[in-house]
Every structure is written in structure tokens, then in C-alpha cells.
Amino acid sequence: MKWAVLLLLPMFAEDGARTTWDGVYTDEQAARGRPLYARECASCHADAMTGGEMAPPLVGGEFLSNWNGLSAGELLDRMRNTMPLNKPKSLSRQTNADILAYMLSVNRFPAGKTELPTDGEMLKQIKVEAMKPEK
């Protein structure tokens, strides 16, 4: 596992921080995250991620403005440490990363060729950006 992380480090160090617009997850990872989200998250956050009485939305403007400029690492840490509400810290890092990949796909961030990592330091290099940067 350490070797995989070391092999990916140059990709993240090329030009500093990446954003959620840089294809930071794969379609396959998002597909794995979909049933995990349905099982672990949808009862509170709704099937369409629109939120519920006690749970905020995980899609759209409110979600994106709350996380804009923060890192995917911070988001994954929040998920890991506080969710599911009835059993925090019970899901693996891989499960949380797959759910986050699904969340990114529903928020219409593009998929890429490399899976969203589970390593916290690598995830801190990925910024959540609500607006697509101009090139």
C-alpha cells in the first residue's frame, strides 16, 4: 500500500493543489460509491442527496458553498469522524472515498483516470472548488 501512495505522489506534486475539476476520481469508483451511499447515507440525506429534516444536502449550491475552498481531505475526515450519525467512524477509508467519489459525480465534477485516494495527506492536496476555473 505504501508503494501505491509513493507512486501517486508525483502526480499530486506537479503543480501544487488540484481541484475537484481535475478528474480526481474514476467512474468505477463513483459506481462503487452509489450503493454504499444508498445503504449508509440516503436514509438521512435522501436518495437524491437533497437533505432531510436533520441532514444537510450533499448536492447543489448549499453543499458547494459550504465546502468551497476546503480540501477533499477535510470533507473525508468530516465524513469519517461523524457519519453515519448512528455509528461514526464505522466505515473504512475506502468506503468513505467511494461515497465521496459518488458525491462528486452527482455534483457534476468530471471523472478522471485515477481513483480518489484514501490517504489524508494526498486528499489535502485536492481543493473543492464550486466554480469551474477558467483556463
At which residue positions do the language-model features occur?
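Sec-dependent N-terminal signal peptides
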Residues: 3-11
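Electrostatic cytochrome c docking/interface patches
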Residues: 14-36
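Glycine-rich, flexible loop/turn motifs
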Residues: 17, 21, 54, 112, ...
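Gly/Gly-Pro-rich "capping" loops immediately C-terminal to redox-active cysteine motifs
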Residues: 24-27, 32, 49-84
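The canonical Cys-X-X-Cys-His
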Residues: 33, 37-48, 99, 103
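Generic structural signal for alpha-helix termini and adjacent loop/cap motifs
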Residues: 47, 81-82, 106-109
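Flexible coil segments in periplasmic/lumen-exposed cytochrome c-class electron-transfer proteins
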Residues: 88-135
